[in-house]
Amino acid sequence: MKKFIALLLCGILTATALTGCGSSSAAGENGEVIVYNWGEYIDPETLTMFEEETGIKVVYDEFETNEIMYPKVEAGSSAYDVVCPSDYMVQKMIENDLIQELDYDKIPNAKENIGAQYYEQAAAYDPGNKYCVPYCWGTVGIIYNKTMVDTPPTKWADLWDEKYADNILMMDSIKDSFMVALKKNGFSSNSLDESELQIATNDLIAQKPLVQAYVVDQVRDKMIGGEAAIGVMFSGDAIYVIGENPDLDYVIPEEGTNVWIDGWVIPKNAPNKENAEKFIDFMCRPDVALKNFEYITYGTPNTAARELIEDEDLKNSPIAFQDLTQYNNLETFLYLGEDGEELFNKYWKEVMSN
């Protein structure tokens, strides 16, 4: 889901953790802050800036999926100060009492610089915006090669077009693949109606002979290299691949899609709460948010940072900063409970086994 360029953050990245971004493993003069974030989802230079300006050492750990992150936070064996979960996982963490309410007086940049529309979107999973500050956001849409696709796609059903057989890329992701199939049929991406889920399952099974591959990060290289005609992609990745291959374009299908938001939260057992607040406030500073946007290319909800973008095309990019009011049926993924997760897992196994 996140930016993939294989840069090493602050040196050697191990399979478990990054034990600090400075030259020494010792805590800074004002202590430390332990951050757990998606891989390649922050400009390393901003971590150095934070350390230099505050005297707080950043201890940095990375995860690949929300489902890998959650049990580590839940177990409490690794006490993190700041974590960056996605929308539905924020809701799950709230319901299971794993994160604490934020004091916006301690993070004034979050209050002043994050656009109201993003807080409104986030309220679907964080009522009252009590627990989470939006960090990045985006959509899921169709990426396509204009030299290989005759007519620009407008519907999710275009991913079932037989003329693109073996040239279609789908996401190796339960939530995202089912979102596509559910939206194709006019259903909610958060549906727990088994008749609707069965229809979506049947569609995904019927599509399988047409699909070249179920991918995550590989979709970028394949689309850049012209190895596929059409596929599913996150908007932030679309910005990157279009920059690498101008034959590519991105569209949100008319049936609607998922609008996702990742944000900063503070776990209940955070050992350095004050430093966590300073870190979140720093990341919401316009110049810092701009650096992170330019590094990871995912849309920033920081409206003050957007005003600092010098490239007018990027500043007004309909992909990076979509006008969501022009689309119908946009939804944020919600946490559907353990029974809901088991239901989606059951139907996904049916798709994969047929």
Language-model-derived ranges and their functions:
Residues P267-Y327:
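Mature extracytoplasmic/periplasmic domains
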Residues M1-V33, N354:
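Short, low-complexity disordered leader/linker segments with a strong preference
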